[in-house]
């Protein structure tokens, strides 16, 4: 799952329309590479400017809002090469452009890759990307039980 945690000052992403538009553009990044939409989770977290310090100084709303984004990738690991990383950050930048950059807001983000084996949906181990089970999850847009999706602690097996 991609998990986006967007930290922003009050007055930014306040209305449902602006949140929905950004979340839709973020979701397109991942559906374009074959992930089901339900994998994509976006949290909007308003943070008072008095609670954000940049360089040891409180970051006030004026003159420019500061947006901090933490992105966690779990479903797919990126190839460890500059071209892949640049393509990925380019896709992220394109999604952010109309919602953040074009408004002149300051924005910083980073992407973390989390261990896939520590990830579950409703107790199910997500199927491997592009497997037949994965295609069912994409088609149904929800977790669907399949053989091997459950780990039995008692038996030490699937």
State what each model feature region is.
Residues 1-158:
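A domain-level signal for the structural core that forms small-molecule/cofactor-binding pockets
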